[in-house]
Structure formats: C-alpha cells, structure tokens
Amino acid sequence: MSSAGIAALVGNEMDPLMAHEAALRGIDARKHRARQLTGRILKDADVVLVFGPEHVEWIANEYPEHLAKAVSLGQAARALQSRPRLASSSWRTLLDDVQALSVEPCEADEIKDPYRRGEGIAKCAAGRICADLDVLSAALSR
C-alpha cells in the first residue's frame, strides 16, 4: 500500500496537523513524502482507494483506462460492513465485492482533504481514514 495525490506537492512532508494526528495513532509519518499519482502507479495497482469524487473524476480524465480500479475508501468500508459474511478475502477481489454488494458511492463516504484546513478537519480526516482502513483490514485478513 502506498499514497499518492492528484495535486501533490511532490517531495513535501506530510502536513504538520496530519502528521500530528498520525503520531497520535502510533504512525510515524516523518519519512512520508508527497508524490503525484501517475499512470505507472495506477498500472501497478490492483486497487486505488480514493477519498472523494474529485479523485475519481481526475483518474477518469487523465487515465481512463485505470478508472475501473478506483473505489472510494468510505464506499468500500461501508460495503464490507453491510455484508461482513460476503466480504472480500483479498485486495484483488475488493472491487468485485463492492460491486456485487451493490453499494453505490454517497456523499457520506467522502473524506475531505485536510491540507491547510485546520485541526478539526485533520482530526476528522485521520479518524475516518483509520476507521475505514480498520474495516478493510479486518475484512481482508479473514
């Protein structure tokens, strides 16, 4: 698993507020550096977890051949929570499972970009990211 953004400040450290939130959750973000999402990254990925519709739109415009790999992190977590017994057994089948469960994306799935938006947004984003990844991790490690 790795991270890349659609408007990355390539090489920059994690936003200080998000780095603080990561540290509170036991994650050392000191080595994290921003990188731009590229066709190569998308080509090598089995699944691309996005935070909002703007990410899906960017992939559709820039690399439409990889659009089928994109799913909202919140949507995937909600799908796996809704039908835990039908949940995925691997990252490679995650997209098929979300589609099979017929869970459509919704506004509640979105994780707002916390960059330079203050402590409250950073805390909310970090909490959502961790909670959603916990759901995926638990479902995919069964």
PLM segments and residue spans:
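Short polar/charged helix/loop
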Residues: 1-142
